[in-house]
């Protein structure tokens, strides 16, 4: 087998500024893993004929390399009829340079990586993909098919330079993971709820330079979570980024979202709950640009789309919304500021500053606050936290609301009844910024 054009990575995990608590990423490079052992799935029975099931070959390659090594999926088209549970890896990497097409019909997760450390999944060519063909389910009204990718209890990891398309259910879930980095990804799903882009909970995780198209979660933090940094995110006809849904014993702290661009989505950012308990604190949401979204800043502690949970409500405190620009679809119907907090667990120390948005339809917009205390717009600045409701109507556009768009903004969604094409990974995910890390394809050809 010819030598693999493996992306050169630093031996030490990366440390960045922000809400992270320490270094993130694999502890050893793909080069060192390959030098220990290389397991090509073709040697374990895989055939790039878009017919032969790759599931057993990938499982066997993992078993052979899980104690240290690199698993290689060469360019080509592979069918996946049986799902894989890849467990107990130590210093293991997977290079996906081919395209995996779902042919199986089981539920669960097509690819589950669990109880592993020092793990990396990426594509040398930045074109490796998994095509879930979710439309086969969705056109029948079925949203209970498999997820594409799930990491569970994985530490010191990276997932990058891969494309996930048309998941029957969620696209990518990180469940109780730590010290990880996710970047340079494109996720493209159907235009329906229940088809989440990225859901993450855990500790010390950096998600950046990701494009998501769907109609549910773009990049969403769930509980429990701490020290999560999310930046340079392109929600391109999506549900939008969010926190939640939040229920009993919520425990979220030290979260930073910045440089988030949202186009034709449900919201720019939503914190959603209905009853429940616990806390969300020390969160910053800054440098947001939006256009054509139904909601913009949306905190809803009585979110009717979830069943009410026992408890007085999730306590939100020390949350800052800063430097938001752009336009919303209809500011009279759904104003750009909505901070609706629980009467029995009011929000405290909320800050809204440098916020300038204007309606695309009509000539007025509203700001609504309920039981929310802090500084800015309709928030009440008071030592008292008794319940209140106020709505302000604005008929003059604020200065500085104008914001640029992205050239790749979609003009329509991909529906739910036809196959969705595999996109390429962009090199910019926020106006005026290039990706923090170059695509792997650029590094391997340099």
From Swiss-Prot:
Residues that carry a glycan: 50, 115, 124, 236, 281, 318
EC category: hydrolase
InterPro entries the UniProt entry points to: Glyco_hydro_28, Pectin_lyas_fold, Pectin_lyase_fold/virulence, RHGA/B-epi-like_pectate_lyase
Keyword Electron transport: no
Similarity annotation: Belongs to the glycosyl hydrolase 28 family.
Gene: rhgA
Record keywords: Carbohydrate metabolism, Cell wall biogenesis/degradation, Disulfide bond, Glycoprotein, Glycosidase, Hydrolase, Polysaccharide degradation, Secreted, Signal
EC id: 3.2.1.171
Membrane-traversing stretches: none
Cellular location(s): Secreted
Positions annotated as active site in the UniProt record: 216 (proton donor), 291
Name of protein: Probable rhamnogalacturonase A
Top-level taxon: Eukaryota
């Amino acid at each position: 087998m010819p030598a693999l054009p493996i992306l050169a990575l630093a031996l030490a995990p990366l440390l960045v500024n922000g809400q992270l608590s320490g270094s993130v990423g694999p502890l050893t490079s793909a080069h060192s893993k390959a030098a220990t052992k290389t397991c090509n799935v073709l040697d374990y029975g895989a055939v790039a004929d878009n017919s032969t099931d790759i599931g057993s070959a990938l499982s066997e390659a993992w078993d052979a390399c899980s104690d240290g090594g690199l698993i290689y999926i060469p360019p080509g088209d592979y069918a996946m009829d049986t799902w894989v549970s890849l467990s107990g890896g130590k210093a293991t990497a997977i290079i996906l340079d081919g395209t995996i097409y779902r042919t199986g019909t089981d539920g669960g997760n097509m690819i589950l990586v669990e109880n592993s450390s020092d793990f990396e999944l990426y594509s040398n060519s930045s074109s490796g993909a998994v095509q879930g063909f979710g439309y086969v389910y969705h056109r029948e009204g079925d949203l209970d098919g498999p997820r594409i990718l799930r990491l569970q209890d994985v530490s010191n990891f990276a997932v990058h330079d891969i494309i996930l398309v048309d998941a029957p259910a969620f696209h990518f879930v990180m469940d109780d993971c730590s010290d990880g980095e996710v970047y340079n990804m494109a996720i493209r799903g159907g235009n329906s709820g229940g088809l989440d882009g990225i859901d993450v909970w855990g500790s010390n995780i950096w998600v950046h330079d990701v494009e998501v198209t769907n109609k549910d979660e773009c990049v969403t933090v769930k509980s429990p979570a701490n020290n999560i940094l999310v930046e340079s995110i392109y929600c391109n006809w999506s549900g939008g980024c969010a926190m939640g849904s939040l229920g009993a014993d919520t425990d979220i702290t030290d979260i930073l979202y910045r440089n988030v661009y949202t186009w034709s989505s449900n919201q720019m950012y939503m914190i959603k709950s209905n009853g429940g308990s616990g806390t969300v604190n020390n969160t910053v949401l800054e440098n947001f640009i939006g256009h054509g979204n139904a909601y913009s800043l949306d905190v809803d502690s009585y979110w009717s789309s979830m069943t009410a949970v026992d408890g007085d409500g999730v306590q939100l405190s020390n949350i800052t919304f800063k430097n938001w620009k752009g336009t919303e679809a209809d500011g009279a119907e759904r104003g750009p500021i909505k901070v609706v907090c629980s009467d029995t667990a009011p929000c405290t120390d909320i800050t809204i500053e440098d916020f300038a948005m204007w309606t695309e339809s009509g000539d007025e917009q509203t700001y609504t606050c309920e039981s929310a205390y802090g500084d800015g717009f309709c928030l009440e600045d008071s030592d008292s936290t008794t319940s209140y409701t106020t709505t302000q109507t604005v008929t003059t556009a604020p200065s500085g609301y104008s914001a640029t768009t992205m050239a790749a903004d979609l003009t329509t969604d991909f529906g739910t009844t036809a196959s969705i094409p595999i996109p390429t990974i962009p090199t910019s995910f926020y106006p005026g910024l290039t990706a923090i890390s170059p695509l792997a394809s650029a590094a391997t050809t340099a």
